[in-house]
């Protein structure tokens, strides 16, 4: 009798776990249908170089567009705790991960918004990081040309603004097929 009860409990637990996995996979896949690009994490090895290139100063406002899991926001917070940090993420799963990872940060210093970066006002940004596909980069350039604060510094990983010349290109000296090959720095 005890063995039957144990097997039934294990069976129910396996069913619950399988259902949870299916829900997470469906949630993830459906978020990809409505997002302009999938979530691709920034390689850990390049994060310090991104933070260095941003050169975030106290009191500045930093935007991470397509902030994914919040990795860049947390690195910037560790480097410059007196900056205001804003992450914008459209896809649900990375958004929730970023919210969870930044839950202990002061709300006046770090915020995660679930929104389209093209529909948010970006005019308060002093610094910005992007790791976005070319189609979205083209749309973002048009938006920034209209509303960027003079002096805005944008650091882009791998992808470029086709119609804007970077003020600096940093070769990250990564293996040929690895993500995170170059940082392009733009000034508006």
Protein language model annotation of sequence segments:
Residues 160-188:
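Active-site capping/gating segments
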Residues 71-81:
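Conserved SAM-binding loop of SAM-dependent methyltransferases across substrates and taxa
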Residues 2-57:
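S-adenosyl-L-methionine
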Residues 58-68:
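Conserved class I S-adenosyl-L-methionine
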Residues 98:
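Conserved SAM-binding loop
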Residues 105-117:
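Conserved SAM-binding strand-loop segment of SAM-dependent methyltransferases
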Residues 151-160:
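Conserved beta-strand signature within the Rossmann-like core of class I S-adenosyl-L-methionine
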Residues 84-89:
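Conserved SAM-binding motif I beta-strand of class I
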């Amino acid at each position: 009798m005890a063995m039957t009860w144990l097997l039934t409990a294990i069976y129910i637990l396996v069913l619950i776990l399988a259902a949870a996995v299916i829900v997470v996979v469906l949630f993830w896949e459906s978020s990809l249908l409505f997002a302009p690009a999938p979530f691709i994490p920034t390689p850990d090895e390049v994060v310090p170089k991104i933070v260095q290139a941003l050169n975030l100063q106290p009191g500045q406002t930093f935007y991470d567009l397509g902030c994914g899991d919040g990795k860049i926001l947390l690195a910037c917070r560790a480097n410059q705790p007196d900056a205001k940090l804003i992450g914008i993420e459209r896809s649900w799963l990375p958004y929730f991960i970023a919210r969870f990872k930044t839950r202990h940060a002061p709300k006046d210093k770090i915020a995660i918004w679930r929104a389209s970066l093209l529909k948010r006002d970006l005019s308060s940004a002093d610094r910005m990081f992007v790791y976005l596909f070319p189609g979205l980069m083209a749309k973002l350039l048009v938006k920034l040309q209209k509303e960027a604060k003079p002096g805005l510094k944008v650091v882009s990983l791998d992808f470029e603004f086709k119609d804007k010349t970077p003020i600096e290109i940093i070769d990250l000296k990564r293996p040929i097929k690895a993500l995170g090959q170059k940082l392009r720095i733009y000034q508006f």
